[in-house]
Amino acid sequence: MVMTDPISDMLTRIRNANTVRHEKLELPASKIKKEIAEILKREGFIRDYEYIEDSKQGVIRIFLKYGSSNERVITGLKRISKPGLRVYAKAGELPRVLGGLGIAIVSTSKGVMTDKEARQQQVGGEVLAYVW
């Protein structure tokens, strides 16, 4: 099966595993998926992730994070820029997710980063997803 949007697939797998409170999930690896997983870890939305080398493209194992009474840390994930409708924003026009409580993941000329980091570096780019 040909996958037309691997980022949407990643977000959907995280959302589904999070909904049923799985401890971890695995997905096919790519450079952009590793960068997104690193952002989610750095911002405290997941516990950890690891890259597992195999004979094909590799696998990313993501360890989900839950609160003390098993409440979800990730309450929402939304894909913004899709293959059929790309969404770009200048540095000054980058969206604030839930008034700063969430993050926007942005692909810029300086790499994949959060909306806050892109504003600090004064770069715009493609708005990939919102996480809150």
UniProtKB/Swiss-Prot annotation:
Quaternary structure note: Part of the 30S ribosomal subunit. Contacts proteins S5 and S12.
A biological process from GO: translation
Whether Membrane counts among this entry's keywords is no
**What HAMAP family is this protein classified in?**
Ribosomal_uS8_B
Name the Pfam families on file.
Answer: Ribosomal_S8 (PF00410)
Family indicated by similarity = Belongs to the universal ribosomal protein uS8 family.
Identification of the protein by name: Small ribosomal subunit protein uS8
Alphabetically, the GO molecular function entries are: rRNA binding; structural constituent of ribosome
For this protein, the record's InterPro entries field holds: Ribosomal_uS8 (IPR000630), Ribosomal_uS8_CS (IPR047863), Ribosomal_uS8_sf (IPR035987)
Q: What does this protein do?
A: One of the primary rRNA binding proteins, it binds directly to 16S rRNA central domain where it helps coordinate assembly of the platform of the 30S subunit.
Domain of life assignment: Bacteria
A single Gene Ontology CC term: ribosome
Give the record's keywords alphabetically: Ribonucleoprotein, Ribosomal protein, RNA-binding, rRNA-binding
**What gene name is listed for this protein?**
rpsH
**Per the record's keyword annotation, is Ribonucleoprotein included, yes or no?**
yes
